[in-house]
């Protein structure tokens, strides 16, 4: 948990200049790469369609261990670009922020959880996929 604290502190303490026109990019060494099996397992466990998760992955285009800044001060982390606004909820479920960033399997599980959460909120897979990245256009 201590490593997760330092990771989050590093992300939030970057200079304001990092939030200029370009997105700041921070890269940490991956713990475990994302594989197709990771995505298949996440889909199976969450009950979400595997095709939806692969579509989100293709759209988000992140990398294991990589974080990209957003203009609102949040960060998108890992292959599925899970936004840091979800980290407290994930931590309450026992998922460390560092794992979401650096472990491809955990990132896929977090993405599947988020898609499932949006599906439960909207009742529509298409709306859930649309809301995955942002609820606002």
Predicted regions: what they are:
Residues 1-3:
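Positively charged n-region of N-terminal signal peptides that target proteins for export
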Residues 21-137:
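Catalytic glycan-binding domains that act on GlcNAc-containing polysaccharides
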